[in-house]
Curated annotation (Swiss-Prot):
Name of this chain's protein: Large ribosomal subunit protein uL23
UniProt superkingdom: Bacteria
Alphabetized SUPFAM superfamilies for the sequence: Ribosomal proteins S24e, L23 and L15e
Lineage: Bacteria, Bacillati, Bacillota, Clostridia, Eubacteriales
Subunit field text: Part of the 50S ribosomal subunit. Contacts protein L29, and trigger factor when it is bound to the ribosome.
Record keywords, A-Z: Ribonucleoprotein, Ribosomal protein, RNA-binding, rRNA-binding
Family label: Belongs to the universal ribosomal protein uL23 family.
GO molecular function list: rRNA binding; structural constituent of ribosome
GO biological process: translation
GO CC aspect terms: ribonucleoprotein complex; ribosome
Gene3D superfamilies on file: 3.30.70.330
């Protein structure tokens, strides 16, 4: 597997993406070849959060001109990641038949996101 820093390039900050932070949705520009599973693992590793859902969108590069010269902007991929903002404790049975409860082991927001709430 590739390093998480190679998969997540940078946050994608717009008015809409900033509004979605309140709902636990964070938007990133990711490597164009990254899969949803790789994106999930990279976000969980980099930010110590629990990822519930990953949506991706592929964008084609736009055609740009400078006088008679023509070129293309690169293709890119956007990932919208929904994190668990209210983790519930998990209860399970131990070997002795007793019940044990785990507390949350991960964060409920990404403070390093840039223009956070």
């Amino acid at each position: 597997m590739r390093p998480a820093e190679d998969i997540i390039k940078r946050p994608y900050i717009t008015e809409k993406s900033n509004a979605e932070i309140a709902n636990g949705k964070y938007t990133f520009i990711v490597d164009a070849k990254a899969t949803k599973t790789e994106i999930r693992q990279a976000v969980e590793k980099l930010f110590q959060v629990k990822v519930l859902k990953v949506n991706t969108v592929n964008y084609k590069g736009k055609r740009k001109r400078l006088g008679v010269h023509e070129g293309f902007r690169p293709d890119w991929k956007k990932a919208i990641v929904k994190i668990d903002t209210e983790p519930k404790p998990v209860t399970y049975l131990t070997e002795g038949g007793k019940t044990a409860t785990t507390t949350k082991k991960y964060k409920t927001s990404i403070e390093e996101f840039g223009a956070a709430q």
